[in-house]
Amino acid sequence: MAPAGSFESLAAALQGGADSVYFGIGKLNMRSRATANFAEEDLPEIVARCHETGAKAYLTLNIIVYDEELETVRNLCAAAKAAGVDAVIASDLAVITHAHSIGLEVHMSVQANVCNMASVRFYAQYADVVVLARELTLGQIRRIIDGIRDEGIRGPSGDLIRVEIFAHGALCVAVSGKCHMSLAAYNSSANRGACFQNCRRAYRVTDEETGNELVIDNKYVMSPRDLCTVQVLDQILDAGVSVLKLEGRGRSSDYVRTVTSVYREAARACLEGAFSPARANAWMERLESCLLYTSDAADE
């Protein structure tokens, strides 16, 4: 699943081989500060472009919602259904229950920080897809997927719950959906899509008593690594992950095209039994320009 923050990046995602695309509308998504957010009237064209290539179109409506916004949410859900949007990605129960009530497929957002089987069981009454928290290890992901299969946990469609994970992109300093750093510093909430990403900045560590500056190897002390799983993609797919999500709705179309094409090629290689360390290293070289800090794989 590839990101689209503009029509340019939407085209890039589809050119890169994405079989699904996620996007936001206006201020009701986790990229509300973006300058090139789509508008509600763009929905029919977004869906048409995706469906022309056989890709699914997923609307992110994953911020926390206040009472005065519920009518706007309902109107947007109605417009999404009319336009043929394939699913809504959400974390607020007000959005989830309304979308479900009007027959829109629901996918649980990473903002719901789903980390365990109890959460999966609960959300299965509303959602067919669950995006697991970024912070889970590969072993934890595997146990949840095995649990879904063993217990036969099904969503509203009647099919087994599908598990989606973020495969590439930024890692938050906090557990997904639980960071308040931007709100505390700038009164701009990450959970309202308005994160200033102060954790992604360079910092100096100073001893307040002596004034001495501490020597550190990485000045990005609160965000030392980005998420990059291409070198362990065979293990991830072998664990039973159904959807690989690529972060980047605020990135350039070139970024989207490169990352999408690399992961598409790598996933195909896994399915065809052609994945190898040598090919993984080659994919990593192509991704180097798409890593802001340092890369890390999965902690097993």
Which residue stretches match the model-derived regions?
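Active-site beta->alpha loop and helix N-cap motifs at the rims of alpha/beta catalytic domains
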Residues: 39-100, 105-115
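N-terminal basic/disordered segments at the start of proteins
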Residues: 1-20
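Catalytic alpha/beta core domains of metabolic enzymes, predominantly
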Residues: 107, 111-242, 256-259
